[in-house]
């Protein structure tokens, strides 16, 4: 390992499946060491993890970083959003954490929306309309289904809060992650006491919300990790806000993340409040906002179509009027939760490669619809679209996004954007810089830029028309088919 030019910092990404740690040179952004360790998620009706696994995985990831981790002057944790971590008086988990993708609280979400004045009222108060992924609905589920466990709870945390507190001994969170709970009012930037009372959650059980740029605490003795006592600990944040930091996003720059599900977001200086619930009105980690919309069918759905056709995922062919809507898991944007995949326009001369291209087109059409919803009037329509996530490395994804968006497309070379964003936040504690400015200095968004091409309006209009004509069929639930 060559000598670092500046102090070292650690950025952590505790995701659903694993915890990753990067040791980064605060002066240059160079990653000098990295480590990763897995954790498990329950199967069956719920999705749960023991938070102590996250701590153990953090220790293992840091041990893989070697001596570099011991030299770190600051650390920050980014993590999966929405999870409900319940702790007893000793700081031990009362039960496994309910993760973001545990949707058993869907009935509680519907009831809470009705009880507090409907979707519009929720959006105006919290920036979002709560779904079963939100923490507030999970707490409501817990109090109904496991009342003894709920009574034993002495602290409620989010996943990144849990690791931060084990480092510092202090209960803290940040505005980016807490904005996904459903009990933080985005208008006042404070806990909403009426919502908390409605779900019987004592505000005293919640962590202090640390301001952007504020030190959350320092590493305490007895933690068993390679950090020295007194190492600075930043507030940390949720994974999407951390990735935005990792890209050094400026307001109005669009991001499209291609994973199992698709995500579109952009930093905005306007507080979002979408009464339809399609756009989540999250805060970012700096003082602005991070409106975000998701699609359910992205890389996994298109790969499934490729598999059914016996093709490699890159084996697309142009020149077809066929429309394929790959809604294999229902769809969120557009809001068609009961839909299934739909094929229209098949002809004798349609090839397998054209069918695969149609699947890409259908998935990207949904993502661009999501992107249109999150970009505000101040966004620059000519700004390059940042393409991240596993699918961003695929040529077929790149070219489809380019053709249907009509924008330049930039593919950042940096991969671990959540951990990089956390590292930038940690570096900002040392230098006094804004974390996004640190990432821009590190040039984390650098990567090839594909020039804009003429937007394929014919394909977009055709897919929009099929969606409209097929709406009665797509909106039916399975039982009525």
From Swiss-Prot:
It holds the Pfam family FGGY_N. The keyword Nucleotide-binding applies. InterPro entries: ATPase_NBD (IPR043129), Carb_kinase_FGGY (IPR000577), Carb_kinase_FGGY_CS (IPR018483), FGGY_C (IPR018485), FGGY_Carb_Kinase (IPR050406), FGGY_N (IPR018484), Xylulokinase (IPR006000). The record marks 13 as: Important for activity. It catalyses: D-xylulose + ATP = D-xylulose 5-phosphate + ADP + H(+). Its EC number is 2.7.1.17. Substrate binds at residues 81-82. This is Xylulose kinase. It comes from Streptomyces coelicolor (strain ATCC BAA-471 / A3(2) / M145). The gene is xylB.
């Amino acid at each position: 390992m060559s000598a670092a030019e500046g102090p070292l910092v650690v950025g952590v990404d505790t995701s659903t499946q694993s915890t990753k740690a990067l040791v980064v040179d605060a002066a240059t952004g160079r990653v000098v060491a990295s480590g990763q360790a897995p954790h498990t998620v329950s199967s069956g009706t719920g999705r749960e993890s023991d938070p102590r696994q996250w701590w153990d995985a953090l220790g293992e990831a840091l041990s893989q970083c070697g001596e570099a981790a011991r030299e770190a002057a600051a650390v920050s944790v980014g993590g999966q959003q929405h999870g409900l971590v319940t702790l007893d008086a000793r700081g031990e988990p009362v039960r496994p954490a309910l993760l973001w993708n545990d949707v058993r609280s869907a009935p509680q979400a519907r009831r809470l929306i009705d009880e507090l004045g409907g979707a519009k009222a929720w959006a105006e108060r919290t920036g979002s309309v709560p779904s079963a992924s939100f923490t507030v609905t999970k707490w409501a589920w817990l109090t109904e289904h496991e009342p003894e466990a709920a009574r034993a709870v002495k602290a409620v945390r989010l996943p990144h809060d849990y690791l931060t507190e084990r480092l510092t001994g202090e209960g803290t969170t940040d505005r980016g992650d807490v904005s996904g709970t459903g009990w933080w009012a985005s208008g006042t930037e404070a806990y909403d006491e009426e919502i908390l009372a409605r779900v019987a959650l004592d505000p005293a059980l919640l962590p202090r919300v640390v301001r952007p740029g504020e030190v959350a605490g320092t590493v305490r003795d007895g933690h068993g990790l390679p950090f020295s006592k007194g190492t600075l600990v930043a507030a940390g944040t949720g994974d999407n806000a951390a990735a935005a930091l990792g890209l050094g996003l400026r307001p109005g720059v669009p991001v499209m993340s291609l994973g199992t599900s698709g995500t579109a977001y952009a930093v905005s200086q306007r507080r979002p409040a979408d009464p339809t619930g399609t756009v989540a009105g999250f805060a970012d980690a700096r003082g602005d906002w991070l409106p975000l919309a998701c699609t359910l069918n992205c890389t996994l759905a298109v790969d499934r179509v490729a598999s059914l056709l016996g093709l490699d995922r890159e084996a697309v062919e142009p020149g077809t009027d066929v429309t394929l809507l790959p809604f294999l898991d229902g769809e969120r944007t557009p809001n068609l939760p009961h839909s299934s995949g739909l094929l229209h326009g098949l002809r004798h001369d349609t090839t397998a490669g054209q069918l695969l291209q149609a699947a890409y087109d259908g998935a990207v059409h949904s993502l661009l619809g999501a992107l249109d919803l999150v970009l505000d009037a101040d966004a620059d329509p000519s700004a390059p679209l940042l393409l991240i996530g596993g699918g961003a490395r695929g040529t077929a994804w790149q070219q489809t996004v380019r053709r249907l968006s009509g924008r330049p497309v930039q593919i950042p070379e940096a991969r671990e954007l959540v951990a990089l964003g956390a590292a930038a936040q940690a570096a900002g504690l040392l230098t006094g810089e804004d974390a996004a400015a640190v990432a821009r200095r590190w040039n984390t968004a650098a990567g090839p830029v594909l020039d804009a091409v003429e937007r394929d309006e014919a394909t977009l209009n055709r897919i929009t028309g099929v969606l409209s004509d097929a709406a009665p069929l797509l909106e039916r639930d399975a039982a009525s088919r």
